């Protein structure tokens, strides 16, 4: 009986090491050995919004006046590679209409080792775009209306994706001569002739993959530039 109990305990302990969901959390590095053991497919998934994630979103990206139903959103988990070659678990909430396309794009970017520094839910920055962009975070859903309208923005519907936000800023020159740069710390990256690991260039892999899925790139806009931004 004692031997049987010991065997059961050993099996239980060994089983703990086979439970990946608690071991690989968003933002954490994953070793190549772990990826080989579990397989890449294990890390790429689309699901309805889990209860714990929906609680996190309350009052942040999912505001009290949110007109987008929870059922319209999807939670993506993936892997991405930073400029130092580290494999990192990423997460993103998007509209279900683009979820499959976005996951496919992120998987291809990972396979090509296209560098993405950070991919966490913007709720960890209290849905503050400026703070999250300064952290070079990549994200999608954040409910809001277009300024001075009752129209929900593309991000507000989860139909826009921002990639490597610090190095690919939003830039607009107003009629009064004032410049708008978001995030404010991204002014050094307005010169698109320079090369930075996290900079999106027209024609690069990130650009081509999003365009192939029918997304529009903010870097192509005429009256402003939003180099981080892809939308449908």
Language model feature labels by segment:
Residues 1-8:
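Bacterial N-terminal signal peptides that target proteins for export
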Residues 19-23:
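Sec/Tat signal peptide C-region and signal peptidase I cleavage site
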Residues 24-81, 85-86:
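N-terminal module-boundary/linker segments of secreted carbohydrate-active enzymes
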Residues 44, 58, 62, 93-111, ...:
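Active-site-adjacent structural elements in enzyme catalytic domains
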Residues 68-133:
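Active-site acidic/histidine clusters and adjacent loop/turn architecture
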Residues 116-117, 131-165:
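Mid-length scaffold segments of soluble, non-membrane domains
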């Amino acid at each position: 009986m004692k031997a049987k109990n010991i065997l059961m305990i050993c099996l239980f302990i060994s089983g703990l090491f086979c439970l990946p969901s608690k071991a690989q959390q968003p933002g954490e590095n994953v070793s190549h050995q772990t990826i080989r053991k579990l397989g890449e497919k294990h890390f790429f998934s689309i699901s309805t919004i889990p209860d714990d994630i929906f609680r996190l979103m309350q009052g942040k990206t999912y505001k009290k006046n949110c007109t987008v139903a929870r059922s319209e959103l999807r939670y993506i988990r993936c892997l991405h590679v930073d400029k130092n070659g580290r494999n990192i678990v990423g997460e993103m909430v998007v509209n279900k209409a683009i979820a499959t396309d976005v996951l496919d794009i992120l998987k291809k970017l990972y396979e090509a080792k296209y560098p993405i520094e950070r991919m966490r839910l913007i709720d960890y920055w209290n849905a503050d775009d400026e703070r999250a962009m300064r952290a070079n975070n990549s994200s999608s859903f954040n409910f809001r209306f277009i300024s001075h309208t009752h129209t929900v923005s593309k991000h507000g519907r989860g139909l826009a994706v921002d990639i490597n936000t610090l190095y690919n800023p939003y830039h607009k020159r107003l009629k009064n001569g004032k410049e708008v740069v978001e995030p404010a710390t991204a002014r050094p990256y307005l010169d698109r002739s320079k090369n930075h690991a996290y900079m999106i260039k027209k024609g690069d892999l990130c650009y081509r993959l999003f365009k192939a899925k029918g997304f529009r790139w903010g870097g192509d806009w005429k009256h402003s530039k939003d180099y981080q931004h892809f939308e449908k």
